C-alpha cells in the first residue's frame, strides 16, 4: 500500500510526463523528378564533369541530404528536382535506389525517374556524342556460361540463358530480371520532345568517328535516337561480343528490341523500382532511361579489340560530349515535367485529348 505522502509526488511526476512535448515527424518532401546518375569524377562542381556535375550546377541542386550510400543527395526545393549518384554497377544502383525509395524523408509516389548516364554505343547504330532513349533494358549477367574452348562444336557461344539447354534456346522461361520494358508511350514522348535537340560536335569526335569506315551511322555527327540498352557488370569490348550483345537483346525482347548502348546499372535500378512500385512508394511507369555515347563498343576496322579497349581506358573520346548531351537532353524533359506539374503530377505524358 502507498503511503499518503507518496501520492502527491507520483501525481506530480505523471503530470510532468503528460505535459512533455511530443516529437513531430516532418512531412515528407514531395519530389517531382529524380535524376539518377552513376558517377562523378572529382568534386560536384568546378572541375572535370562526370554524370552528376552539370545537374548539380545548372539545376541548382543546392540542398544536401546525407545519404548512407555512395554519394549524398542534392535537392532543389523550388523545382522539386532531386539528384543522386548511385555508384557504378548494378549492385550499387539497385541498393541506392532501394534505399532512396524507402527513405521516409521523401514522397516519391508521383515522382518521375530519369536515368541519365553515359554508355558504349554500337557503331552500327550511332556515333559517339549521340543520345538514345531506351524502351527495353536487358541484363547481360544472368546466364549460364561454359568456356568457349569446351562448348559443343555447333554452339555459337558458351553463354546462354538460365533454365535453358543451349544458346538462344527458343524455349526460354519468362524473364525474371533478364529483361524489363519501360512504358513505351512515355519513352516515345521523351524522344519526340528531344529529337531536334542539337548535340555538341568537335574535331576530336570527327577524328574518332572517321576511322569507322563502313559504319555510316558511326560516322554521323551526334544525333538523337531510340535504342535499347544492355546492362552488365563486365566492361566488355570487341566485334564478337558486340554481335553477342545484339543477339542477346533480340533474344530477350523477342526481336522487338535493338541493342544500341552498353552500360552497367539500368536493370539493377529498374529491378528495385519494380519492388518499390509494389509497395506504392514509386510508380515504375514513370521511368525514363537516357544513355549517351562516350565510346564505341568495338574497334574500327584495322585495330584489335585489345588495342582499342586499352586506348579507351586512358579516356573516353566522347566523355565531355556525352556528359553534356545527357544534361542537354535530360533537362528538356525535366523542365517540361516540372513546368507543367499541375498536369503531370496526376497524368503521365503523353496527354490524350
Predicted regions and their residues:
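Bacterial N-terminal signal peptides
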Residues: 5-16
Amino acid at each position: 500500500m502507498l503511503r499518503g505522502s507518496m501520492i502527491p509526488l507520483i501525481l506530480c511526476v505523471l503530470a510532468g510526463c503528460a505535459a512533455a512535448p511530443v516529437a513531430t515527424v516532418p512531412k515528407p518532401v514531395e519530389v517531382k523528378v529524380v535524376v539518377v546518375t552513376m558517377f562523378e569524377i572529382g568534386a560536384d562542381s568546378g572541375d572535370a564533369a562526370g554524370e552528376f556535375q552539370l545537374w548539380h550546377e545548372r539545376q541548382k541542386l543546392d540542398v544536401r541530404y546525407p545519404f548512407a550510400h555512395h554519394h549524398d543527395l542534392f535537392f532543389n526545393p523550388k523545382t522539386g528536382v532531386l539528384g543522386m549518384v548511385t555508384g557504378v554497377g548494378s549492385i550499387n544502383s539497385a541498393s541506392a535506389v532501394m534505399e532512396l525509395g524507402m527513405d521516409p524523408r521523401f514522397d516519391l509516389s508521383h515522382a518521375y525517374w530519369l536515368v541519365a548516364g553515359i554508355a558504349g554505343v554500337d557503331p552500327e547504330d550511332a556515333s559517339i556524342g549521340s543520345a538514345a532513349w531506351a524502351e527495353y533494358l536487358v541484363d547481360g549477367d544472368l546466364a549460364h556460361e561454359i568456356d568457349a574452348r569446351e562448348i559443343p562444336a555447333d554452339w555459337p557461344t558458351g553463354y546462354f540463358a538460365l533454365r535453358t539447354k543451349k544458346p538462344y534456346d527458343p524455349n526460354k522461361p519468362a524473364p525474371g530480371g533478364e529483361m524489363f520494358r519501360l512504358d513505351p508511350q512515355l519513352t516515345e514522348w521523351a524522344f519526340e520532345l528531344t529529337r531536334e535537340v542539337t548535340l555538341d560536335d568537335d574535331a576530336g569526335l570527327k577524328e574518332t568517328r572517321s576511322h569507322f569506315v563502313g559504319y555510316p551511322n558511326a560516322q554521323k555527327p551526334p544525333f538523337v535516337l531510340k535504342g535499347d540498352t544492355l546492362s552488365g557488370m563486365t566492361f566488355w569490348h570487341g566485334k564478337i561480343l558486340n554481335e553477342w550483345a545484339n543477339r542477346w537483346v533480340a533474344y530477350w525482347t523477342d526481336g522487338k528490341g535493338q541493342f544500341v548502348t552498353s552500360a552497367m546499372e539500368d536493370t539493377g535500378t529498374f529491378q528495385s523500382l519494380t519492388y518499390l512500385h509494389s509497395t506504392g512508394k514509386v510508380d515504375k511507369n514513370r521511368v525514363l532511361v537516357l544513355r549517351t555515347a562516350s565510346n564505341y563498343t568495338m574497334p574500327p576496322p584495322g585495330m584489335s579489340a585489345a588495342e582499342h579497349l586499352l586506348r579507351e581506358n586512358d579516356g573516353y573520346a566522347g566523355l565531355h560530349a556525352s556528359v553534356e548531351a545527357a544534361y542537354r537532353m535530360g533537362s528538356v524533359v525535366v523542365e517540361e515535367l516540372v513546368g507543367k506539374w499541375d498536369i503531370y503530377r496526376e497524368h503521365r505524358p503523353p496527354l490524350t485529348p
